[in-house]
């Protein structure tokens, strides 16, 4: 509607997650720390300063750790910000090979997703959300638009408004207070299986290609 495109000409085909995340080990209840993790590109659009501001608000939560895995244009700025604020419980890992990522996911009690408060960016659903769900992880976010819609529909976590550090901190406290956090992870995985699997993606894509008369080499689809 915003771009005067006929809705009948649009098909929603969300990204699926790599199969390597299907067997991520889940955290045991005996763990004494709460480990939150962001994994992915670290750029301006991701608004990770919101995470660091939330970490500052919650600095007295001594059992809380924030893990940031990835690289990007804002990484050095974030490291500097964390150092200036003396956020010793924020840990940066840099970029890691994709085949090592499941072991990092296994560390996390919940995954983080944040976006800048941009009305066009809010229309997107970052691929990390599907990956988080494939791994069976609860999600804590600070974003507007599609991300909170999915988190709410899946009943897999909590989401504050974009760039709202206080709201993100409150969402983290709600997660910590939830004695049934494991259920959030199970809900996350269940929603992934219902909406974001590779088979569903390929079947949907093939269906749409059939509608447009696409032909494979040597065969009609």
What spans do the regions from the language model cover?
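Conserved acidic donor-binding segment of nucleotide-sugar-dependent glycosyltransferases
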Residues: 153-154, 158-165, 174-179
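C-terminal alpha-helical cap of glycosyltransferases
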Residues: 174, 198-221
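A short, active-site helix/loop in glycosyltransferases that binds the activated sugar's phosphate group
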Residues: 1-9, 19
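Carbohydrate-associated surface elements
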Residues: 13-16
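A conserved mid-protein helix/loop that constitutes part of the nucleotide-sugar donor-binding site
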Residues: 34, 42-57, 76
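Nucleotide-activated donor-binding/catalytic signature segment of Leloir-type glycosyltransferases, i.e.
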Residues: 33, 62, 67-69, 76-103
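A short, well-ordered alpha-helix in the C-terminal region of glycosyltransferases
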Residues: 167, 174, 180-195
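Short hydrophobic beta-strand element within catalytic cores of glycosyltransferases
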Residues: 110-113, 131-142
């Amino acid at each position: 509607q915003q771009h005067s495109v006929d809705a009948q000409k649009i098909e929603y085909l969300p990204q699926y997650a790599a199969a390597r995340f299907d067997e991520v080990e889940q955290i045991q209840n005996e763990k004494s720390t709460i480990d939150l993790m962001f994994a992915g590109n670290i750029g301006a659009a991701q608004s990770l300063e919101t995470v660091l501001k939330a970490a500052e608000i919650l600095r007295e939560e001594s059992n809380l750790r924030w893990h940031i895995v990835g690289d990007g244009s804002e990484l050095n700025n974030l490291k500097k910000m964390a150092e200036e604020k003396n956020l010793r419980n924020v840990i940066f890992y840099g970029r890691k090979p994709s085949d090592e990522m499941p072991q990092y996911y296994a560390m996390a009690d919940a995954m983080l997703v944040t976006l800048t408060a941009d009305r066009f960016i809010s229309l997107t659903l970052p691929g990390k959300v599907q990956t988080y769900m494939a791994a069976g992880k609860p999600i804590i976010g600070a974003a507007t638009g599609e991300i909170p819609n999915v988190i709410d529909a899946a009943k897999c976590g909590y989401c504050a408004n974009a760039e709202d550090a206080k709201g993100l901190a409150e969402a983290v406290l709600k997660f910590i207070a939830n004695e049934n956090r494991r259920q959030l992870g199970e809900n996350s995985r269940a929603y992934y299986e219902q909406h974001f699997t590779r088979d569903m993606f390929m079947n949907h894509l093939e269906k749409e290609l059939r509608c447009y008369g696409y032909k494979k080499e040597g065969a009609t689809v």
